[in-house]
Amino acid sequence: SILLDVFFTTNILLSLLILMVSIHTFRPLDFSSFPTVLLFATILRLGLNVASTRIVLSAGHTGPDAAGKVIEAFGEFVIAGNYVVGIFVFAILIIINLVVITKGAGRVSEVSARFTLDAMPGKQMAIDADLNAGLLTSEEAKKRRDDIAKEADFYGSMDGASKFVKGDAIAGILILLINIIGGLIIGIAQHDLPVSTAAENYIILSVGDGLVAQI
C-alpha cells in the first residue's frame, strides 16, 4: 500500500506537470512528444489500476485503508459519509470525463489532423513560391517543409492517442464495477462481512481508486 501511495502521488504530479507544460506551449512542435507522453501516462495509470484492483479484492475486507492513504482519502472525500451518494457523484464525474472531456478531445484531435493534412499541399506550394521568388533560402525552405511534416505527424499521433485515452476511460468504468461487485461477493461470501460493512469498505476503495485513476 505504501508503494501504491507513492506511485499514485507520482502519477498525479506527472499529470499536473503535463498539464502545465501543455498550457505554456504555444506551438504543437514545442511539445511534439506529447502523444508519446500521453500514451506512457495512460499505460502507467492502467498498471496502477491493475495493482490497486488486486489489493482491493484481496485485502479490502480489512478496511478502507487497505489500498493506501491516497485511495482512502479520495474515496472518503467523494463519499462524504454516504456511499450511495458517493457512487452517484462518481458516476457524474465519469460521465463528464467520458462524454464531455474524452469525446470532445478526441473530436478536436480528429478534426485538427484532417485540416492539417488538407492544408499540407497549399503550404508546400507557398514554400515553393517563396523559394522561387527568392524570399527563402534552400535551408529555410527545407526547415519549413520539415516543420509541416512534423506537425502533420503530431496531429496524426494525437488522433490515435485520443482513441487510446477513450479506451482507458471505458476501462476505468469496468474496473470500478469489477471492484464493487467482486469486492461485495468476496467480502460477504469469503470473509463473512455484514452487507453494510462490505459495501462501505469496497465502495470507498473502488470509488477512491477510480477517482485517483481518472485524475
PLM region spans:
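Hydrophobic packing and interface segments
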Residues: 1-215
